[in-house]
């Protein structure tokens, strides 16, 4: 039992380290803050249209699920997946894809950086 507990504790530490590293990378890549991004994601009501595993208020089905954004090739159906493009899409989706169902919600550039940091951590 002690060996199993020690192995479990070791795996927990490994997973925690991996998550911390993912958060650091997302913040460095986007210039945003993951925790503020999760709060902004909720505040702007993004979860009303989009699902994100592990985020209780994000269970929408109108828009695509937002897990795995970091590994997608394209953002908004048109742009290369780069932080600046994701942020542009979040701030003004109509400028990227006129007629898209995603509305312009008044997201500030600072909030878009934070939301993009949050999304890049969702696997």
Briefly describe each language-model feature range:
Residues 14-42:
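Electrostatic cytochrome c docking/interface patches
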């Amino acid at each position: 039992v002690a060996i199993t507990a020690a192995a479990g504790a070791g795996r927990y530490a490994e997973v925690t380290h991996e998550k911390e590293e993912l958060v650091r990378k997302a913040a460095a890549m986007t210039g945003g803050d993951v925790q503020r991004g999760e709060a902004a994601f909720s505040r702007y009501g993004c979860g009303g249209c989009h699902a994100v595993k592990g985020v209780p208020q994000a269970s929408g089905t109108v828009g695509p699920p937002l897990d795995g954004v970091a590994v997608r090739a394209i953002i908004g159906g048109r742009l290369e997946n780069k932080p600046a493009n994701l942020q542009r899409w979040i701030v003004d989706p109509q400028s990227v894809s006129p007629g898209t169902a995603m509305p312009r919600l008044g997201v500030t550039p600072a909030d878009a950086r934070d939301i993009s940091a949050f999304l890049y951590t969702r696997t």
